[in-house]
UniProtKB/Swiss-Prot annotation:
GO biological process: endonucleolytic cleavage in 5'-ETS of tricistronic rRNA transcript (SSU-rRNA, 5.8S rRNA, LSU-rRNA); endonucleolytic cleavage in ITS1 to separate SSU-rRNA from 5.8S rRNA and LSU-rRNA from tricistronic rRNA transcript (SSU-rRNA, 5.8S rRNA, LSU-rRNA); endonucleolytic cleavage to generate mature 5'-end of SSU-rRNA from (SSU-rRNA, 5.8S rRNA, LSU-rRNA); ribosomal small subunit export from nucleus
Transmembrane segment boundaries: none
GO MF term (any one): RNA binding
Tagged with keyword Heme: no
The protein, known as: Nucleolar protein 9
Pfam families the record matches: PUF_NOP9
One cellular component (GO) term of this entry: 90S preribosome
Biological role: RNA-binding nucleolar protein required for pre-rRNA processing. Involved in production of 18S rRNA and assembly of small ribosomal subunit.
Compartmental location: Nucleus, Nucleolus
rRNA processing is among the record's keywords: yes
Amino acid sequence: MPRDKQKRGRRAEAKRKRDDVITDPTVLKRQKSSDVCNYPNPSYEQLEIRGDYIPLDEEPVDYTGTPFYGLLDIEEQEYFSHASGLLELNQFETEEEKSIFIERVYEEANGKELKIACSQSCSRLMEKLISASTVSQIKRLFSKFIGHFLNLVQHRFASHCCECLFIHAAQYVTSEMKKKSSKEKENLEEDSTSELQLEDLFLKAISELEGNWGYLLTERFASHTIRLLLLVLAGKPLRNPSTTTVIASRKKENLASKVGTQLDPSISEKRAVPTSFNKALEKMMKDLVAGLDNTYLRALATHPVGNPVLQLLLSVELSHMGKSKAKDPDSLLRRLVPDENLQGDGESAKFLKGLFYDPVGSRLLETIVQDAPGKFFKLFYKILVRERIGSFSRNEIAGHVVVRILERLSKDDLKSAMDMILPEVAPLVERSRLTVIKALIERGIVRGVDLGPLAAALLSAYGDDAVSRINNMLKLQRSNKESDGTTSSSNTSSPEQLHGSLLAQAMLKSTGPLSELVQSSLLAVTTETLISIAQDPVVSHVLQDALTLPTSTPQFRRQITSRFSGKIAELALHSSGSHVVDALWPATKDLLFVKQRFAEELVVHERALRDSFVGRAVWRNWSMDLYKRKRGSWIAIAKGLEDSTEINPNALTHKPKSNIDLARARFAAKANGSKEPS
C-alpha cells in the first residue's frame, strides 16, 4: 500500500526553530524561574514541557486576588496577647472597669481590625472582645468588616470572628426592631443617617456573598458562616443543642463563658426577625441551589462539608416556610426525592436507602424524618422502613435514624415496631448499642405502650443474677479496674458506660418491671459497690434517679437509704457523691428518723464540710444551720411542712384575728377616721 509523501527532517527542523528562540541557557533558566514564581499553577508550568502544545485562549490562574491585610508588629502582638489574657482571667473589680478596658482595646485596635481577625495569635482576642461588647461597639466593628466579608468568611481565623459577630449581633436585631416600632407609634423623628441599623448591616454582608454561594457551600470555613446566616435570617435558636452541632464542630470553644459574659436568653429561643430577613432568606436559599442539578444535590448529601448546609436548608424550608412547601416541585425535598410513591427500585427509594448506612448522609435522613410532612413520613415508613426496622436497628449508623423514626410513630405503629426489634435486643446489648432500646422505652412511656415484653427481653439479655446484671449494664467491673490502676484518667468514661447509664435512667422512669430490674440490682450489690456507684460521675445519675423519681416505692427507699449510714460525710465531700446526698433529702421525706441520723453525721463533720466547696453546698441544701439553731423548724421542713407557722411567719395573717388584734384595728380606724373593721 503506498505511503503518504512526507518531508524528511521535519523533527530536526522543529528542534532548530525552538533553539533559535532562546539560545542562552541562563535566560531560559531565569525565565522558567520567573514563570514559576508568577504563576504557581501546575497546569500552566507544563507549557514548557511539550513543544507542540497549542495553548487555549485563556489566561493563567491568578492567585494574587486574595487580599493581604498586613501583619501586626511585635509590640502590637504583645499588647493584644496581654489584653486577651486579661479578658480571659476576668478579674475586673467592677463592670465599669471592664467596659473601660474593652473600649481602650477597641481604640488601640482602630484601623487594625482586619489584621487582628486574620492573625493566628490575636483572632481569639477579637472573639473575646465581641463577646463582651455593647451594641454600639458591635455596630462599629460590623461596619469595619463591610466590604471584606467574602474574604473573611473563607479565612481560617477570621471566619470564627465573623461567626461570633453574627451571633452577638443577632440578639440585638429583635430589640432594635421593637424600638423602631415604638418610635414609629410615638411619631418621633430620628436621624437615620447617624448610624446604620444591624438589620441593614446584615443585609449588606449577605449582598457581598451573593454570586458565590455555590462555591462557599462546600468551602471548609465559609460553610460554617452560611449555616449561621441561615439560622439568623430564619430567627431560629442559635444556642440550641440541636443546632449547635450543625453550626460548628464539637471542638469549637465557647469563649463567651471564659470572658464571663451572658448571652441574651432570646438567643436560645426562636426570635422575631424583620420582614426584610424573610425576603433575604428566600433569595439566599434559592440562590444556594439555583445552579445545582439534582445529581449534585444528592452528592452533597454525603459530602462532609456540604451535608450540614443541606440539613439546615431542609430544616428551614420545612419548618420556617410551612409544610406545604414540600409539595412544590422546585422545593429542596422534592428535588432530592422527586418520586411521590417511593415504589420499587426507583431513584428516590435507592437514594433514601443508601442514606441509612452512610455516616454522613444518615444525618440528612434524620432531618428529613424529623421535619417532613406527615403524609410523606407515613409513606416513607410504610414502604421503606416498617418491614426492615429490625435490621436497621442492628446497624450502628442506621440505628440513629431509627431513633428519629420511633419519635414520630403512633401507638399502634410503635407497638408493631417494638415487636420487630425485640429479637435484636440481645445482640444490641452484647454490642452495647443501646440507643434504640432507650428510645423504645422513652416513646413507650409517652404513648402508653406495654413495655413488659421489652423488660423480659432485657432480663434475658442481661441475665437473672441481679449483681451481674447491674455490673454488665453500668460496666462497673471496668470502672473498678481503672480506679485500682495507676492511670490518672479517673474522670473519663467509656461510651459503653455512658450508654448503659442512660438506659438505666430510662428504665427507672417506667413503672413496672423495667424499673424493678434496676432497683432490685441496686439493692443486691454490696455497700462498697453502692458507694463506688455514688462516686462515679456517670453512673451516679442512676442512683440519683432511683432515689427521687416517682417510680421509687417507699419500700425501696427505706431499704436503699439505710445502706448509706456512716457514709454520708464521705459522700458529701465528693464531687459526684454530694449530688447523691442531695438526692437523699427528698428520698427520706417520709423517713424522718433516717434523715435525722444523716443530719447528725453531717454535724459531726461540720468543719470538714465548711472547708469544702461541695461540702458547703450539701450543708446549705440540708439546712444544717437551722438544724443546729431551731431543731423544731428543721423538723417541720424535713416533714414537708413549709406552710407551717414556725417556718412561714406570713401564715399568721391567714388565722382568725384575736381580740387584741381586733382592738388594735378599731383604734387605728378611729385615728384615721374610717369605719370600724368587721
